[in-house]
Amino acid sequence: MKHLYLILLLACALGVNAQQQVLEGDLLFAYSSTTGRAISDATVHDSTALPIYHVAIATWIGDRLYALEAIDEGVVLTPYDKFQERTKNKGGMLIGRLHDRSGVDQSVSNAMEHLGKPYDDLYMIDTQEIYCSELVQLSYVNGKGQRLFPLINMSFHDAKGRILDYWREHYAKHGMAVPEGALGTNPAQIANDPAIEIIKQQ
């Protein structure tokens, strides 16, 4: 029984230590262990070849670490351990860190202003709703207040240029054509940005 207690205590200490290595404003990229039907070439991280489907923002509130993220429930604060467990069940997580951290505090403050907004499952910019990588793109600035991550032309197609059936069906439910080429953002684009260094895979 004593040995079991010591093992549990060590596991807890290791978990806390791992959290302490995460800095304010680090970006948490969730990746899938399988390539789903919604994954296109544009959502793959270049150096790891991992399909990235989500991004969140690490933020410390007191001595507790959270993932600030846009999910189905809207823009919410998720305890880091719950976020980590959720991503682990689907694949894993990459932790990204800005090379230049001079604008981190302002960036996180900007993101917190979106807390409570509804989720945008159509991935359109300039609406009151917001999706995961849009939260990062809108919020992250350098020390001069300039946005770090540009908008890109969104891609919903496979390597052969064919729009994936998943996205055709998804937008058809809303009476829309797939917005191929429209301005937007995605998690892999941010993970691949030269402003970011991937420091850890979990």
Where are these regions (language model features)?
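Sec-dependent N-terminal signal peptides
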Residues: H3-A13
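Boundary at the C-terminal end of the N-terminal hydrophobic targeting segment
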Residues: V16-Q19
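Loop/turn positions that initiate beta-strands
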Residues: E24-D26
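Extracytoplasmic/secreted envelope proteins and their assembly/folding machinery
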Residues: Y53, V104-V108, M112, S133, ...
